[in-house]
């Protein structure tokens, strides 16, 4: 165990996602201390050795070591990447039974250390497991965050930017709802340079509208395509987790589409779901309730109902 000298991030689960996330943290100089925790201690130790050998090339060398749950006591942020992976043909919701029990053990072990920081959940189905983390930890809802639709939104902006030949950073568009098959695009509020995307395609005809629909389908189904080709997705989500981590540790008050607890916004209660939220050192400062059109409202409530149906099997509502 190291002596705290700055921001500490504990990464639980050093598989593809956890190791890629730790690598992103180191390369971007986001954290001062990174502790790697895994049931396979040799894997965590090997990763720590590998990262330390590259420390001389990092913009801000962090202390990196393999540890155990006691190291979470002084952590500012615990990021859970552990759990069963999604296999070809499986949906994210198929993973619930496998991962609920794993999460109970992880979260209870973290809390037993005296941990008083924030949780960030990456494991799928992320909305369900973020809710489970909140329940198992007993922490205030704003201190438990899921990666939500941050990657879906990034995919959406990339594909729209590619279609319109503009930088994705200049595309303002959100994917909200479940990080999964019932997610939805907020076309009514999507714009490029202040010009609504719907207006941009008006003059392009029916084929342009069909292309937008194809873009969303490619966003929604991206994980299936990547899993089929290479077995797992990890680089994109690792970079998304690093972005959320920076917003937290640097107290940015950044708006990101994370899995946040709703207790009224969007007409929903008692569910974690992907929505834009203001993120800072204290966790979720507030949920941003963007205006949805009637069709988007219908699809958002359908997405929330899907998640609640799963939650009802495990938690008393």
Swiss-Prot record:
<dbReference type="InterPro" id="IPR001557">
    <property type="entry name" value="L-lactate/malate_DH"/>
</dbReference>
<feature type="binding site">
    <location>
        <begin position="124"/>
        <end position="127"/>
    </location>
    <ligand>
        <name>substrate</name>
    </ligand>
</feature>
<dbReference type="InterPro" id="IPR018177">
    <property type="entry name" value="L-lactate_DH_AS"/>
</dbReference>
<dbReference type="InterPro" id="IPR011304">
    <property type="entry name" value="L-lactate_DH"/>
</dbReference>
<dbReference type="InterPro" id="IPR001236">
    <property type="entry name" value="Lactate/malate_DH_N"/>
</dbReference>
<feature type="binding site">
    <location>
        <position position="43"/>
    </location>
    <ligand>
        <name>NAD(+)</name>
    </ligand>
</feature>
<feature type="binding site">
    <location>
        <position position="172"/>
    </location>
    <ligand>
        <name>beta-D-fructose 1,6-bisphosphate</name>
    </ligand>
</feature>
<dbReference type="GO" id="GO:0004459">
    <property type="term" value="F:L-lactate dehydrogenase activity"/>
</dbReference>
<dbReference type="Pfam" id="PF00056">
    <property type="entry name" value="Ldh_1_N"/>
</dbReference>
<feature type="modified residue" description="Phosphotyrosine">
    <location>
        <position position="224"/>
    </location>
</feature>
<comment type="similarity">
    <text>Belongs to the LDH/MDH superfamily. LDH family.</text>
</comment>
<dbReference type="InterPro" id="IPR036291">
    <property type="entry name" value="NAD(P)-bd_dom_sf"/>
</dbReference>
<dbReference type="InterPro" id="IPR022383">
    <property type="entry name" value="Lactate/malate_DH_C"/>
</dbReference>
<dbReference type="GO" id="GO:0006089">
    <property type="term" value="P:lactate metabolic process"/>
</dbReference>
<feature type="binding site">
    <location>
        <begin position="83"/>
        <end position="84"/>
    </location>
    <ligand>
        <name>NAD(+)</name>
    </ligand>
</feature>
<keyword id="KW-0963">Cytoplasm</keyword>
<comment type="subunit">
    <text>Homotetramer.</text>
</comment>
<dbReference type="GO" id="GO:0006096">
    <property type="term" value="P:glycolytic process"/>
</dbReference>
<feature type="active site" description="Proton acceptor">
    <location>
        <position position="179"/>
    </location>
</feature>
<feature type="binding site">
    <location>
        <begin position="122"/>
        <end position="124"/>
    </location>
    <ligand>
        <name>NAD(+)</name>
    </ligand>
</feature>
<comment type="function">
    <text>Catalyzes the conversion of lactate to pyruvate.</text>
</comment>
<dbReference type="Pfam" id="PF02866">
    <property type="entry name" value="Ldh_1_C"/>
</dbReference>
<protein>
    <recommendedName>
        <fullName>L-lactate dehydrogenase</fullName>
        <ecNumber>1.1.1.27</ecNumber>
    </recommendedName>
</protein>
<dbReference type="GO" id="GO:0005737">
    <property type="term" value="C:cytoplasm"/>
</dbReference>
<feature type="binding site">
    <location>
        <begin position="152"/>
        <end position="155"/>
    </location>
    <ligand>
        <name>substrate</name>
    </ligand>
</feature>
<keyword id="KW-0021">Allosteric enzyme</keyword>
<keyword id="KW-0597">Phosphoprotein</keyword>
<feature type="binding site">
    <location>
        <position position="38"/>
    </location>
    <ligand>
        <name>NAD(+)</name>
    </ligand>
</feature>
<feature type="binding site">
    <location>
        <position position="147"/>
    </location>
    <ligand>
        <name>NAD(+)</name>
    </ligand>
</feature>
<feature type="binding site">
    <location>
        <position position="92"/>
    </location>
    <ligand>
        <name>substrate</name>
    </ligand>
</feature>
<feature type="binding site">
    <location>
        <position position="157"/>
    </location>
    <ligand>
        <name>beta-D-fructose 1,6-bisphosphate</name>
    </ligand>
</feature>
<keyword id="KW-0560">Oxidoreductase</keyword>
<feature type="binding site">
    <location>
        <position position="233"/>
    </location>
    <ligand>
        <name>substrate</name>
    </ligand>
</feature>
<feature type="binding site">
    <location>
        <position position="105"/>
    </location>
    <ligand>
        <name>NAD(+)</name>
    </ligand>
</feature>
<dbReference type="InterPro" id="IPR015955">
    <property type="entry name" value="Lactate_DH/Glyco_Ohase_4_C"/>
</dbReference>
<feature type="binding site">
    <location>
        <position position="86"/>
    </location>
    <ligand>
        <name>substrate</name>
    </ligand>
</feature>
<feature type="binding site">
    <location>
        <position position="17"/>
    </location>
    <ligand>
        <name>NAD(+)</name>
    </ligand>
</feature>
<keyword id="KW-0520">NAD</keyword>
<feature type="binding site">
    <location>
        <position position="69"/>
    </location>
    <ligand>
        <name>NAD(+)</name>
    </ligand>
</feature>
<comment type="pathway">
    <text>Fermentation; pyruvate fermentation to lactate; (S)-lactate from pyruvate: step 1/1.</text>
</comment>
């Amino acid at each position: 165990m190291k002596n705290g000298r700055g921001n500490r991030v504990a990464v639980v689960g050093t598989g593809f996602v956890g190791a890629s996330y730790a690598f992103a943290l180191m390369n971007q100089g986001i954290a001062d201390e990174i502790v790697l925790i895994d049931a396979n201690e040799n894997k965590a130790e090997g990763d720590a050795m590998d990262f330390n050998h590259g420390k001389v090339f990092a913009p801000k060398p962090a202390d990196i070591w393999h540890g155990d749950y006691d190291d979470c006591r002084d952590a500012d942020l615990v990021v859970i990447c552990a759990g069963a992976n999604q296999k070809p043909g499986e949906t994210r919701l198929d993973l619930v039974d496998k991962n609920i029990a794993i999460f109970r053990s992880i979260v209870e072990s973290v809390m037993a250390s005296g941990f008083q920081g924030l949780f960030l959940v990456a494991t799928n189905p992320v909305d369900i497991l973020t809710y489970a983390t909140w329940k198992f930890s007993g922490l205030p809802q704003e201190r438990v965050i899921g990666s939500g639709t941050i990657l879906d939104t990034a995919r959406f902006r990339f594909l729209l930017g590619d279609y319109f030949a503009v930088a994705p950073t200049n595309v303002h568009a959100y994917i909200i709802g479940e990080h999964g098959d019932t997610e939805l695009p907020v076309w009514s509020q999507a714009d490029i340079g202040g010009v609504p995307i719907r207006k941009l395609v008006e003059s392009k005809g029916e084929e342009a509208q069909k292309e937008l629909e194809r873009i969303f389908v490619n966003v929604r189904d991206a994980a299936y395509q990547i899993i089929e080709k290479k077995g797992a997705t990890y680089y994109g989500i690792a970079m998304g987790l690093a972005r959320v981590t920076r917003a937290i540790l640097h107290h940015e008050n950044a708006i990101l589409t994370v899995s946040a607890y709703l207790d009224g916004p969007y007409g929903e209660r008692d569910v974690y779901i992907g929505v834009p939220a203001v993120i800072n050192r204290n966790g979720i400062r507030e949920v941003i309730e963007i205006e949805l059109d009637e069709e988007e409202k219908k699809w958002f409530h359908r997405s929330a109902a899907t998640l609640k149906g799963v939650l009802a099997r495990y938690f008393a509502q």
